[in-house]
Amino acid sequence: MKKVTFLFLLFAWLMCGGCTNQTDMGYVPVSGEGKIYYEEKGEGEPLILLHGHSLDTRMWDLQFDEFARHYRTIRMDFRGYGRSSKQTETFQFTHLDDLLAVMDYLKIEKAHIVGLSMGSFVAGDMVAMAPERMLSCVMASGGIRSVQGPSEPMGAEESARRDKEIAELKAKGIDVYKREWLETLISDGGSRREEMRKPLWQMIDDWDAWQPLHKEVRMFWAREAWKRLEETCPSVPTLMLRGDSKGEGKPYSPKELKYLPNGTALLLPDCGHMMNMEQPETFNRAVLQFLDGIK
């Protein structure tokens, strides 16, 4: 009887992947009665994946399971994207504030942060504004933005310019805009760029395109983050990645590294902006080797 019970328990354990292969998901309450959707898998040090503009958690499909073999891996939809709450033109928030709220809710004191494109803007904000919450930082296809931050609200001239841009976009049609945006992301790629077309379009097609059709609040610390970075020179281990789709091998020396003493930069061959989707094996290896090197 004991043997039968043991075998049953062993079978159940294997069927649930040792109880570590399950993906937990849920919502985190954030400011302004908002909520952030997240998924979590794996054990170990926390690692959080931050997606790009017009995309969502699915852009990390080729990283999520792999990283979860080594880390407690979390991916989340930013406010205004995927299954998270919508944005408004009036409520001021930053994506960094939402990220920190997710970490607090999940009882994560520090995490490895991996962001691509818009996600790298948030990762850059964090390394400057909240380095004490980071184990490491990976910024791919981007870095800290050089635009107005929350302390510089939109003025009349910028508001009028946005009115004109929004009217032009509505006249063009959002479907045309989405198709053009898709081609922009794909045309930047290397030899495997067409492999991204279907998964990229699935996300872009599902996206409600609220952002280009409205006047967004300042969601990035941006210039304020640059000022803080230059003042503090945080010691967070940092990796900055850029794709080299043309094989030109041009030097990559992002300005951020001047103020990040434990930072390094790396070119990834045969890929463009969406490097994690285009060359997932190369991207995963670069990130995991970087993380292994700082343990």
Regions found by a protein language model. Name each.
Residues 2-47, 69-71, 292-295:
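Alpha/beta-hydrolase fold catalytic core
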Residues 263-295:
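Catalytic active-site module of serine/aspartate enzymes centered on a nucleophile-bearing elbow/loop
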Residues 128, 135-170:
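Flexible "cap/lid" loop of the alpha/beta hydrolase fold
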Residues 153-154, 168-232:
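Conserved alpha/beta-hydrolase catalytic His-Asp/Glu region
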Residues 34-83:
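Conserved HGGG/HGGXW glycine-rich cap/lid loop of the alpha/beta-hydrolase fold
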Residues 122-126:
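Hydrolases whose catalytic domains are alpha/beta-hydrolase-1, hotdog thioesterase
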Residues 41, 65, 75-118, 285:
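Active-site loop/oxyanion-hole signature of alpha/beta-hydrolase fold enzymes
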Residues 232-271:
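Conserved loop-alpha-helix segment in the C-terminal half of the alpha/beta-hydrolase fold
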